């Protein structure tokens, strides 16, 4: 499904929170949306592998990487895993790498920046926790919609036809 965050903001202005414009699109899908699963991890993506092995249909993995752009939390291998398991998208408050490969995958990926250095894989982090960045507080179960214009969040799914 294609989402237009500008149109959604016009319709649901009182019901959505708008994330500050910190993110760029790195995935092959320009718009995406779904129910979020939150993760908090810093320069370590081991936990992301565990989560992305699950069925992601209708879901978006939202990762608070502390805004670090020193190590990429998502690379082509991890994004392929997410695509294979039907995740709608990834929002990374941190960095990604192998961007040419990411652009070829049918998944939405929004992140702050790209850097060639990969993350540790020790599995240090937490999932299903409250995270805050970009002026918005996120909870697992909230609904996120993203496109090249921005990212918005709603507690409940928006009625989109």
From Swiss-Prot:
Lineage: Bacteria, Pseudomonadati, Pseudomonadota, Gammaproteobacteria, Enterobacterales
InterPro entries reported for this sequence: RraA (IPR010203), RraA/RraA-like (IPR005493), RraA/RraA-like_sf (IPR036704), RraA_gpbac (IPR014339)
GO cellular component: cytosol
Family: Belongs to the RraA family.
Subcellular location: Cytoplasm
Functional description taken from the UniProt entry: Globally modulates RNA abundance by binding to RNase E (Rne) and regulating its endonucleolytic activity. Can modulate Rne action in a substrate-dependent manner by altering the composition of the degradosome. Modulates RNA-binding and helicase activities of the degradosome.
Subunit structure: Homotrimer. Binds to both RNA-binding sites in the C-terminal region of Rne and to RhlB.
Name of the gene: rraA
The keyword S-adenosyl-L-methionine is assigned to this record: no
Keywords, alphabetical: Cytoplasm
Protein known as: Regulator of ribonuclease activity A
Gene Ontology biological process terms in this record: negative regulation of RNA catabolic process
Gene Ontology MF, one: enzyme binding
